[in-house]
Every structure is written in C-alpha cells, then in structure tokens.
Amino acid sequence: MSDIFRFDTEEQTLTKEKIKLKKPSKYRVIILNDDFTPMEFVVWILQMVFHRSRAESQQIMLKAHITGKALCGVYSHDVARTKVAQVQQLAEQHGYPLHCTMEVEEGEEES
C-alpha cells in the first residue's frame, strides 16, 4: 500500500489516504501443435525463447503433440507478448506454421 498525503489550504488540514495497489496480471504463453512443424524445431524454440532445458522442452513438445497445446510459461504482459512475437518470427524465418498464444492467467483480471 502506498500513502498519499493531501494538504487542503483552505481548511489547513492534512489528510492521509491509503491507496491499494493491484498486482499486474500474469499471462500464460501456450504453444499450439500443428502437423507440419518438426518436433526438433519445437524443442529448439522452447530452449531458445523460453530458456527451457532439453528435457523440459521435450516434455512440453510432447504434451503439445498429444493434447494440441502446452504451457510454455507464465509471464508479465510485455514479456509474454515478446515471447509470442519471437516464436512467430523464428517460425516464419524457418518456414514453419508454428503458433503461440497468450491468455490471462486464471484468477487474474485484465486491466
């Protein structure tokens, strides 16, 4: 909480108000499966963009392959948006249709 002090010059009183700060929302970055992007490329993306170990990357890739999507990580809005853009850019550069999305973490409200 932050304190704000106001001074009213007409009445010459000092008032202290409490302001409750809201935590910023967190966003889930989800990788989506497709039938064209090689599994090794997905593993490489997870290592490069999301800084996952090879074993973690393989687990995430397999989950996306089996269920159609998988969680890459939970980040602030700007970081999540940047990671989605990085995946898009790398996939396009290599000629693959790989996609990522971002969604607000459950229990969080978008501001």
Swiss-Prot record:
This is ATP-dependent Clp protease adapter protein ClpS. Pfam families: ClpS. GO terms for biological process: protein catabolic process; proteolysis. The gene is clpS. SUPFAM superfamilies: ClpS-like (SSF54736). InterPro entries: ClpS, ClpS_core, Ribosomal_bL12_C/ClpS-like. Binds to the N-terminal domain of the chaperone ClpA. Involved in the modulation of the specificity of the ClpAP-mediated ATP-dependent protein degradation. Belongs to the ClpS family.
